[in-house]
């Protein structure tokens, strides 16, 4: 493991672009044919490692393939509930070719090919990567925290996107604890977690602060998955579209490989 010391310039935090710039700093230090990118709240189950390695070997000389697309499980509130509805990205690029023209895009959720590089959110001179699927999932634990720490995270995250002053003003009036809402509206996880997560799961101690059933608190803003629009789209997708999301933005071109 190589740790790179960098300076986070708050002047560059507009719309989360600092995340992409920091990602590119790490990318420049990498060697090898493929680069595997994970954010701090993302984990790969050890059962997928042989699958990922085999897929990289299979596609190594297929230069049209610029990246590999992973499925996602977005856990919410605890380690037993996850999002599988409209509005949460079901796939994302997490392995890319070691190509200097490929850069982290927007606020570092994904990657693009840049003909020339000015900033992560530039409107021209970029195109989507051509990718192939890999039969593996990324487990995203970014929304599994004690409610007080989750609220702190939201404040920090929005400081990067909104600016520190606006975030301070908003969260000074917000509740101290994040309200996950009724977890019964989500899918229940029946699989196993990665071995590296076992200590975190053993120390899970905020069950009594979660709402398992009932209706959302009417005095707070609804989460996206609680809004009628998203619940309706999720119903249509699951019952009439094979679970595939309708009309969502895909930052990639999927190849048949």
PLM-predicted stretches and their roles:
Residues 1-34:
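Active-site-proximal specificity loops/subdomain of glycosyltransferases
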Residues 16-20, 24, 43-257:
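Catalytic-site signature of metal-activated, phosphate-bearing donor transferases
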Residues 32-45:
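Short beta-strand-to-loop acidic/aromatic patch adjacent to the donor-nucleotide binding site
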């Amino acid at each position: 493991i190589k740790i790179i010391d960098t300076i986070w310039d708050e002047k560059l935090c507009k719309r989360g672009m600092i995340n992409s710039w920091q990602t590119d700093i790490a990318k420049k230090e990498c060697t090898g044919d493929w680069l595997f990118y994970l954010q701090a709240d993302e984990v790969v189950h050890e059962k997928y490692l042989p699958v990922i390695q085999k897929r990289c070997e299979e596609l190594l000389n297929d230069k049209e393939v610029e990246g590999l697309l992973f499925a996602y499980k977005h856990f919410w509130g605890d380690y037993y509930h996850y999002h599988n509805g409209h509005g949460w990205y079901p796939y994302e690029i997490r392995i890319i070719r070691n190509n200097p023209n490929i850069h982290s895009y927007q606020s570092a959720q994904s990657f693009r090919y840049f003909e020339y590089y000015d900033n992560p959110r530039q409107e021209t001179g970029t195109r989507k990567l051509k990718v192939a699927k890999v039969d593996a999932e990324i487990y995203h634990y970014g929304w599994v925290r004690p409610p007080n720490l989750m609220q702190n995270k939201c404040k920090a995250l929005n400081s990067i996107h909104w600016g520190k002053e606006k975030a301070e003003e908003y969260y000074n009036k917000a509740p101290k604890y994040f309200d996950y809402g009724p977890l019964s509206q989500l899918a229940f996880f029946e699989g196993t977690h990665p071995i590296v997560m076992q200590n975190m799961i053993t120390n899970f101690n905020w069950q009594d602060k979660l709402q398992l059933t009932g209706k959302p608190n009417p005095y707070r803003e609804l989460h996206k998955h609680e809004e009628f629009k998203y619940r309706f789209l999720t119903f249509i997708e699951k019952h009439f579209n094979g679970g595939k999301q309708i009309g969502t933005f895909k930052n990639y071109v999927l190849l048949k490989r």
